[in-house]
Amino acid sequence: MAVIVLAAGAGTRMKSTTQKTLHSIGGRTLLSHSLHAAAGIDPARIVAVIGHGREQVGPAVAEVAEQLGRSIDTAIQEQQNGTGHAVQCAMEQLEGFEGTVVVTNADVPLLSPETLQELTATHDGASVTVLSVNQDNPTGYGRILRTNDGMVTAIVEEKDATEKQKEITEVNSGVFAFDAAILRDGLAQLNTDNAQGELYLTDVLSIARRAGHPVRAHIASDAAELAGVNDRVQLAAAGAELNRRTVTAAMRGGATIVDPATTWIDVDVQVGQDVTILPGTQLLGTTTIGDNAQIGPDTTLENVKVGEGAQVVRTHGFDSTIGPRAEVGPFTYIRPGTVLGEEGKLGGFVEAKKANIGRGSKVPHLTYVGDATIGEYSNIGASSVFVNYDGVNKHHTTVGSHVRTGSDSMFIAPVVVGDGAYSGAGTVIKEDVPPGALVVSGGKQRNVEGWVAKKRPGTPAAEAGEAAAKRVAEGGSPTSTPQADQE
């Protein structure tokens, strides 16, 4: 079996500098969806016909072929002269091929391998089999013409149809299965005697019928699979339908999705059992979610591996790893190359980039960790910064295990903090810290008495300070603020 995927059209209704089939839904381009479907029936050959934007589409075909681990040939349609001409170009790549040739389109992203398999099963023994679908509104589609006993005789395009024929609701999906020899013979007889002046692939069906060859139609059970994408409105509709199917599959696989309407999951995402996904979550790319994890609300993860039992709240992360039973968020930004270990924590308003954070270590609040390695069971105080950039190069910081650093610590890379070390609040760490040491960088605090009254006279601060000084002189409190009891 061979599959031809037609991807040469201009797609002018997309109004885009990007070729139509390279627009994406569900984490794949339209082209990628169609090539994955083609590969899903395990054909001996796949040929993609490219034309408009081929400098973009050609490399995209090669990329998908690499992802699939198989070869995909390309045929170039220099001038777009109809679907029949496109298939003629493809058949030049299939010289000498015998068997079934399936023809499909790169702008039908929901078409599944299962439907293609049903088509080829119906086709067994026929010369041509068209995949048809019943449409409530068939406007714009080619109509399937049948005899009184139900035999398919022809497909008539909308522009060539009579008013009576336009009332037919069974339409051509643009997907066919052909006997290779019948296809070659039919392509050789095509002409442009039609309203559009093009070579219609659908005319091969009529040619085969007139020659006495059996022609069949397989009516698709799921019309939504065959919805084409020609503009941005249809792109959005196809994306929404694909997402509905993906989200439904995740729920049937054992995940709880609290609000499917606000949850978006790409087709290559893997979601484990007993996962809970809260509203406003996007799982993109090749993200994987381990069993019993909780994701969201308002979380976007792209190419992130999340371990079992992890909790990720109001977080944006990509190209990173979150370990089992780790806690992330809220309002956390995880950048590429970050690995958060088992039972680790990245808390509120923490940003991590190329950070390897060991098992049980915590970065709870308001901290930037960049180009760093942190060992096991360490705690980084609030408002700390790993200062990794000298204006030209990035440098690495290493923090050992069981380290405790005070709030507002600055790690001036490159620097190493040994196991078990402590730092005082506000410490600027410029040099390596020995294991078990306490590092402090500030000198003795100096209070300049009366500075505010002298330098800011007449201000509310000066007046408050003078009043408090009188209270202190009389044995009272230095502050009007009630002081909490100290335990």
Swiss-Prot record:
Q: Which residues bind acetyl-CoA?
A: 382, 388-389, 407, 425
Which coarse location class applies to the principal site listed for this UniProt protein? cytoplasm
What does the record say about how the cofactor binds?
Binds 1 Mg(2+) ion per subunit.
- Listed binding positions for UDP-N-acetyl-alpha-D-glucosamine are 6-9, 20, 77, 82-83, 142, 157, 172, 230, 335, 353, 368, 379
- Superkingdom, according to UniProt? Bacteria
Task: List the catalysed reactions.
Answer: alpha-D-glucosamine 1-phosphate + acetyl-CoA = N-acetyl-alpha-D-glucosamine 1-phosphate + CoA + H(+); N-acetyl-alpha-D-glucosamine 1-phosphate + UTP + H(+) = UDP-N-acetyl-alpha-D-glucosamine + diphosphate
Which pathway is this protein engaged in? Nucleotide-sugar biosynthesis; UDP-N-acetyl-alpha-D-glucosamine biosynthesis; N-acetyl-alpha-D-glucosamine 1-phosphate from alpha-D-glucosamine 6-phosphate (route II): step 2/2; Nucleotide-sugar biosynthesis; UDP-N-acetyl-alpha-D-glucosamine biosynthesis; UDP-N-acetyl-alpha-D-glucosamine from N-acetyl-alpha-D-glucosamine 1-phosphate: step 1/1; Bacterial outer membrane biogenesis; LPS lipid A biosynthesis
Instruction: Give the binding site residues for Mg(2+).
Output: 107, 230
Region of interest (Pyrophosphorylase), residue spans: 1-232
- SUPFAM superfamilies for the chain: Nucleotide-diphospho-sugar transferases, Trimeric LpxA-like enzymes
| Residues that span the membrane, as ranges | none
Query: What EC number(s) does its UniProt record assign?
Result: 2.7.7.23, 2.3.1.157
- Matches recorded under InterPro entries: Bifunctional_GlmU, GlmU-like, GlmU_C_LbH, Hexapep, MobA-like_NTP_Trfase, Nucleotide-diphossugar_trans, Trimer_LpxA-like_sf
Q: Where is the composition biased (Polar residues)?
A: 477-487
Q: Name one GO molecular function term.
A: magnesium ion binding
Q: Which cofactors?
A: Mg(2+)
Q: Which GO terms describe its cellular component?
A: cytoplasm; membrane
Q: Its quaternary structure?
A: Homotrimer.
Q: Which family does it belong to?
A: In the N-terminal section; belongs to the N-acetylglucosamine-1-phosphate uridyltransferase family.
Q: What is this protein called?
A: Bifunctional protein GlmU
Upper lineage ranks? Bacteria, Bacillati, Actinomycetota, Actinomycetes, Mycobacteriales
